[in-house]
């Protein structure tokens, strides 16, 4: 049977085909229009915006941390140096999961939990492309282990950064201080742009006081990097500005000598140029090695320092407060002249004690049998307590307080070191405010000989002595002598005023002569010398109170219950170049403290001019980088002196800070 097939409708098929073509062409045109509009959006209307965003993905600004300024002594001896260390770093832009990377790096870089916590704290506030230190001061073993698995951590780099090094170890620790890693509290207060790429900041001492000068200004380098943070091109840079170099008023040789005197002892020595207020030496013993703190002290070392009964971290010279004992008698005597209560001829008969009218309690002199007929000159020479009991009773605590504050007691000196203590010059208002009780007249008597609640720092005693040497002119103590660098800074060396004194200049001369006689024939006669004249005053401060009627029995006391020995003085007496304050904790009496001051005077006035102590050559006017020396290759601070007198600072002396109980003074048979 024959099949029949319908004929094709050619026209209809053409229409269908043509429609499909038009649809396809239209679809292509629409797609092209979408692409063209998107292209116009990106490349024409928002070109600048997206071009910048694109560049940010491949062009980065890397901070260039500034080199920290060096610190020198007055003669150019290098006290604080910079040294390169290897540091592991990363940025948030380089890794997908920061926590995972850090966890994987812990066994490789031997990260402690403290390292991890510090890194996480810093990375939180860092910019996305800012590189943050994971660990400072990597060892060769750390670097070798990381090199083997480096391919697993494309965003982690080993970089060279500068860190701090103190070539003289514990010798200047309490003055210079140290730098340490920036902590959470500091992160909130610093200018993050100014500290970009920086891990260290001044913590105590000069490093903290002059952080703004020492730190410098960071620079930046523009680089092109790929997705793995590998640098492809260096596009340009702005160099950092290094911090200012600081030249301190301290003298290396004098610091060595002063430190030697306190080796194995607890105490402090402060030496000042009374003409300018420049601090020539400042020693607190025992001391510590500041290098332990720079890249992070471990728990064991810190616990050893913190829990040490001798408190090596405690700056006795600036923070330590002690009863000043008889060292303040020259200043107090000048107050008697100021108020017209006594003159140089005023004399008393000293039976060895004093009692207030209507009170049977005896305030005893240190010399049980008394000093006989005593005028002001003899009272200073023999350190007659009874004379000052009578003077204080006539002067009264209010006038005493007003007068003694002019010498700086009970207030900060304004020294350019942090954490200075005010000490305390007690008065009725203070007692009512703090103890809710009235002032007793017997307390005035105790204060008159530097006991009771009266406390002062060694720095305050040195300043009061400098004011006495200056005939009342006041200078501000300071350790900064000069700076060199991009940041201007003016150091003041001129006297900033004079105390209000109603007497004459001749009165100051007579006081100087009395203090000279203290050394020639009085309680300080153990340090007299024909080579120059010293004007001084000894002092003894009770640590353990003694009941009325009881004798001071040294044999019955422990070593830490023995009296403190103090000494203040200046020399040459007629044209003072140096004023000194010494506190020897539990040193028994002021004569012992004077023995510690004598070598300091000798070095400054004699030895320094002929045979000054200098450290090894590579520690003068340069850095470890210049000398090509690693910290481990340096001798310790104790081995660096090249002259024979006084070889070192103390490394582990003994000391706590016992305070004298504020009670009525009792008999003390020890010669002050």
Curated annotation (Swiss-Prot):
UniProt keyword list: Carboxypeptidase, Cell inner membrane, Cell membrane, Cell shape, Cell wall biogenesis/degradation, Hydrolase, Membrane, Metal-binding, Peptidoglycan synthesis, Protease, Transmembrane, Transmembrane helix, Zinc
Regulation: Inhibited by the beta-lactams sulbactam and piperacillin-tazobactam.
Pfam families reported in the protein's UniProt record: PBP_dimer, Transpeptidase
Predominant subcellular localization, coarse grouping: membrane
GO cellular component, one term: plasma membrane
GO MF annotations, alphabetized: penicillin binding; peptidoglycan L,D-transpeptidase activity; serine-type D-Ala-D-Ala carboxypeptidase activity; zinc ion binding
InterPro entries per record: Bact_Transpept/Beta-Lactamase, Beta-lactam/transpept-like, PBP_dimer, PBP_dimer_sf, PCN-bd_Tpept, Penicillin-binding_protein_2
UniProt enzyme class: hydrolase
Membrane spanning stretches: 21-41
Active site: 326 (acyl-ester intermediate)
Region entry Disordered, spans: 616-672
Places the protein is found: Cell inner membrane
Null allele phenotype: Viable under standard laboratory conditions. Spherical cell shape with increased maximal cell width.
Feature: compositional bias, Low complexity: 640-672
Biochemical pathway: Cell wall biogenesis; peptidoglycan biosynthesis
Keyword Kinase attributed: no
EC number: 3.4.16.4
Effect listed in the UniProt record for changing residue 371 to A: Decreased zinc-binding. Decreased structural stability. Loss of short-rod shape coincident with increased cell width. No effect on binding to fluorescent beta-lactam bocillin
Similarity annotation: Belongs to the transpeptidase family. MrdA subfamily.
Family annotation (NCBIfam families): pbp2_mrdA
HAMAP family named in the record: MrdA_transpept
Task of the protein: Catalyzes cross-linking of the peptidoglycan cell wall. Involved in the determination of the rod shape of the cell.
This protein's name: Peptidoglycan D,D-transpeptidase MrdA
Annotated source species: Acinetobacter baumannii (strain ATCC 19606 / DSM 30007 / JCM 6841 / CCUG 19606 / CIP 70.34 / NBRC 109757 / NCIMB 12457 / NCTC 12156 / 81)
Lineage: Bacteria, Pseudomonadati, Pseudomonadota, Gammaproteobacteria, Moraxellales
